[in-house]
């Protein structure tokens, strides 16, 4: 361990890999507190679809960056990095170990490798205008929205598939907030890391992972995911960027009578599997991770391996 830098543990892995359980049990062992590195768990009222940790699962371990925003608020890597850095300082100063657990690769990467990210903070009045502008576009279908983006940011439009509505909206929102093009944004990676980082990843065979994902989707639906999405739509959040997340965007057409339930569930499972594949590609290609094989290691074995790495 480098005593000149704050020590942090980061646990990454694809959706449904078991990051929550591992991080909580590790926190018990090493006197840690957990910072969520998930871009969706910051939102209130979006619990089941984001697989948000429950108070019972927390088992007394403090968790941070969960339930801090409303679904119509925006959150970016910049906000995450700023908040996480403050939390790491606070947790470390109290003699505890910060544990960052999550699957949003850019968020984790920006923190570990000290990306310089642009501040998108706006006043409440400016944010209100941005929301009004975005609301005026909600009637557009995916292709029309993509065409709108191409009118002022052709480079971003070329790099984003029309069906990826969330990323298209993100590029448009960025322009509305900053008057700049997302395609021109510079993301500078520093080569001096801020932290002494132990980066742990959970992996397993694709067959096992996909089976876990399919099972978890079924459990989410049994626990009321459809009703959760209904309530968010009823509360007026349907057009928000947060509602383009996997688990929400697939069920909205069912609520609106545009798709049958069974097809939406199949889409949800497929999109979740595809997302998990993208997550693993990101972590394998862009980060130096110490991988733990969940299929051949029990929870206790993984905890022992991590604590050995810390010593």
Curated annotation (Swiss-Prot):
Q: Where does substrate bind?
A: 15-20
Check the record and name the InterPro entries matching this protein.
Answer: Dimethylallyltransferase, IPT, P-loop_NTPase
Annotated positions binding ATP: 13-20
The keyword Cell division appears for this protein: no
Q: What class of enzyme is it?
A: transferase
Q: What is its EC number?
A: 2.5.1.75
User: What is the official name of this protein in its record?
Assistant: tRNA dimethylallyltransferase
Give the organism the record lists. Answer: Staphylococcus aureus (strain bovine RF122 / ET3-1)
